[in-house]
């Protein structure tokens, strides 16, 4: 199955490992945008790649937004419904959902550091790169399911934890949607988040089956200091090398 497409020069790269990243110019269409609006814009204006595929790495929300559209095309249903039926409901994640354009009437703002609310903005209804609203308890259910292999095969999970952004040698790398810090005795698998006033920390110590989960809805960079807890699991570990 195919989504709308356009050609760009260069070899193939992976959207999910950020080794093929598209430069998305500012979209001037009025009103709230969804994923299809974004794709329509790309098809029309054909934005170029930021770099030659597999030659470098840069984080890209656009890549994940495109992947959500690909999922919809493959499964034949919208991404929020697919996530609910395939992951959230089976794992008992009762307080987790994907926010989309149809949910604007129940929009709950996040907050600036000064407690002023963020109003809903142009890109707030695009999902895949963000817009999963959850709780610490629900995320722990998901985390434990990853350890148990109850809904994803361990072989598939290992693929996600393999380095994919190998543009330069480093202890830091990016897999299939996960950041990783490669240590002599284990990999620390993690991914922090930020959108408007929402901050999140999600760090997995696979060897110890331990996980740090922190969520906040008022912007505060101190949330990322939760990575300092990593020293409790790794003797002599310098937590400052974990990226925000």
Label each residue range with its predicted role.
Residues 153, 197, 208-209, 231-236:
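Short, low-complexity, polar/charged sequence segments that are solvent-exposed and flexible
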Residues 1-196:
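Short, surface-exposed loop or secondary-structure junction motifs
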């Amino acid at each position: 199955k195919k989504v709308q497409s356009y050609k760009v020069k260069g070899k193939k790269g992976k959207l999910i490992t950020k080794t093929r990243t598209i430069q998305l110019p500012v979209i001037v269409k009025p009103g709230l945008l969804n994923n299809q609006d974004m794709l329509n814009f790309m098809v029309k204006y054909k934005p170029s790649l930021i770099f030659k595929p597999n030659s470098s790495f840069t984080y890209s929300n656009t890549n994940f937004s495109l992947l959500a559209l690909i999922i919809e095309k493959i499964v034949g249903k919208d991404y929020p419904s697919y996530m609910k039926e395939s992951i959230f409901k089976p794992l008992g994640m009762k307080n987790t959902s994907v926010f989309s354009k149809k949910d604007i009437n129940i929009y709950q703002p996040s907050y600036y550091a000064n407690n002023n609310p963020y109003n809903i903005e142009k890109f707030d209804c695009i999902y895949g790169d963000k817009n999963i609203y959850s709780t610490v308890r629900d995320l722990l259910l998901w985390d434990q399911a990853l350890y148990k292999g109850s809904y994803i095969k361990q072989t598939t999970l290992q693929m996600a934890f393999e380095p994919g952004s190998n543009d330069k040698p480093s202890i830091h790398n990016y897999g299939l949607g996960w950041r990783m810090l490669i240590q002599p005795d284990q990999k620390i698998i993690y991914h922090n988040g930020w959108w408007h006033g929402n901050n999140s920390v999600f760090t997995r110590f696979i060897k110890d089956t331990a996980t740090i989960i922190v969520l906040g809805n008022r912007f505060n960079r101190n949330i990322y200091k939760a990575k300092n807890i990593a020293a409790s699991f790794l003797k002599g570990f310098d937590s400052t090398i974990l990226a925000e």
